């Protein structure tokens, strides 16, 4: 649900 370098459903990946 996100993209690199953040690859996982975590707050740092959320829009």
From Swiss-Prot:
Keyword Aminoacyl-tRNA synthetase assigned: no
Name recorded for this polypeptide: BtIIIB
Domain notes: The cysteine framework is III (CC-C-C-CC).
Keywords: Disulfide bond, Neurotoxin, Secreted, Toxin
GO molecular function terms listed in the Swiss-Prot or TrEMBL record: toxin activity
Distribution of this protein across tissues and organs: Expressed by the venom duct.
Main subcellular location of this protein, as a coarse class: secreted
UniProt source species: Conus betulinus
């Amino acid at each position: 649900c996100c993209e690199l370098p953040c690859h996982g459903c975590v707050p740092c990946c959320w829009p």
